[in-house]
Amino acid sequence: MFTINVETRKEQGKGASRRLRTANKFPAIIYGGNEAAVAIELDHDSVMNLQSKPGFYDEVLTLVVDGKETKVKVQAVQRHPFKPKLHHIDFVRA
C-alpha cells in the first residue's frame, strides 16, 4: 500500500505549473466518483521513488489531501520527452 501526502494547488495554469516544476514539484488532479475534481501538487522526488516500485501503477494508492484520505488509482502519466521527469499525473477515485 502506497501513501502520499499532497497539497491542494493554490494557483492553476501554465505559469503556475512551471513554477511548481522549478520548485521540484509537479501538478496532478484527482477526479471521478461523486465529488468534484481536485487539483493537487506532489513532490517530484518522492513520487519518482515510489513509481519505480512494483505495483505503483496497479494498486490502489492513498492520497492524504489536507488531512483527508482518498483512495485512488493512477489513470494517466505525462513525462518529459527526454529527461527523467514527471510532468503530470491523473488519479481516478477508486
Curated annotation (Swiss-Prot):
Q: Name one GO molecular function term.
A: 5S rRNA binding
Q: Does the keyword RNA-binding apply?
A: yes
Write down the SUPFAM superfamilies for this protein, in alphabetical order: Ribosomal protein L25-like
An annotated GO cellular component of this protein is: cytosolic large ribosomal subunit
Which GO annotations describe the biological process of this protein?
translation
Stored Pfam families: Ribosomal_L25p
Keywords attached to this entry: Ribonucleoprotein, Ribosomal protein, RNA-binding, rRNA-binding
- NCBIfam families attached here? PRK05943.1
Q: What does this gene product do?
A: This is one of the proteins that binds to the 5S RNA in the ribosome where it forms part of the central protuberance.
Query: How does it associate, per the subunit comment?
Result: Part of the 50S ribosomal subunit; part of the 5S rRNA/L5/L18/L25 subcomplex. Contacts the 5S rRNA. Binds to the 5S rRNA independently of L5 and L18.
Q: Which HAMAP family match?
A: Ribosomal_bL25 (MF_01336)
Family the entry assigns: Belongs to the bacterial ribosomal protein bL25 family.
Q: What's the protein here called? A: Large ribosomal subunit protein bL25
